[in-house]
Amino acid sequence: MASTRAQVITRRTYNRPLNEEGTEFESWEQTIGRVISHQKWLWERAKGETRLTAEEWNELAELQQLLLDRKAAVAGRTLWLGDTEISRRRESSMFNCSFTIVETVYDVVDVLWLLLQGCGVGF
């Protein structure tokens, strides 16, 4: 069982609202289901097909159980934005931190763009 503090932070940060009023929120199980759905979508897209093998399904099921049991964690960005429309349209919304070598004005533009998306940038 998660501590009260962890539950408050999870509700505030990761559980997505289920209604327009923002009075009902995902449960931890629903949040993890959304994360697994996002991971499945990433896998299908990377493979270029929508059929996963039995081994891949088993890996997703194992990941889901580890996340539900709080024995493993994914990036906070994935908990927050995973399987949302914005994460599919703007992949940079999922960037957490990055590194670049700034040599030109174009590199500065890239850095500013990433910073505006909420991504930390080291250089």
Question: Which ranges hold each PLM region?
Answer:
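Extended catalytic cores of very large enzyme megasubunits
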Residues: M1-F123
